[in-house]
Structures are given as structure tokens and as C-alpha cells.
């Protein structure tokens, strides 16, 4: 079986994994209330989507 000839150093391992990272979700301000919300989703604070109230929020 193939076995690595030398131990992989921390630097080489970290350089190889440098592109692996967490992505920030795309947040946009709600045009109705101004709160940040995910794109193409109903606003959790006011319940509006595309200028229409979709979810009834008792605020």
C-alpha cells in the first residue's frame, strides 16, 4: 500500500485547506421595515414578501 514518506507539516496542511471557510449568508434589508433578512425569503419581523403581507405577525 502507498504510505506517505514524510509527516505532513501544519503549514502544508493549512495551506492546502486555506480555501475551506464558512460562507456569510446573503442578507439584504427589508424594503418594508428595514430589518436584515435572507434574500428571496419572507421577512421574519414584518411578514412581508414582494410588497405583500404573507405571514401575519402580531407586533
UniProtKB/Swiss-Prot annotation:
**One BP annotation, GO:** translation
The protein's UniProt keywords, in alphabetical order, are:
Ribonucleoprotein, Ribosomal protein
Q: Keyword Ribosomal protein, does the record have it?
A: yes
The protein here is known as Large ribosomal subunit protein bL32
Answer whether the UniProt record assigns the keyword Ribonucleoprotein to this protein: yes
Residues annotated as transmembrane: none
Q: Cross-referenced InterPro entries, in alphabetical order?
A: Ribosomal_bL32, Ribosomal_bL32_bact, Ribosomal_zn-bd
An example of a Gene Ontology cellular component annotation for this protein is:
large ribosomal subunit
The entry's family comment says: Belongs to the bacterial ribosomal protein bL32 family.
Q: Which domain of life is it from?
A: Bacteria
| Pfam families attached to this UniProt entry | Ribosomal_L32p
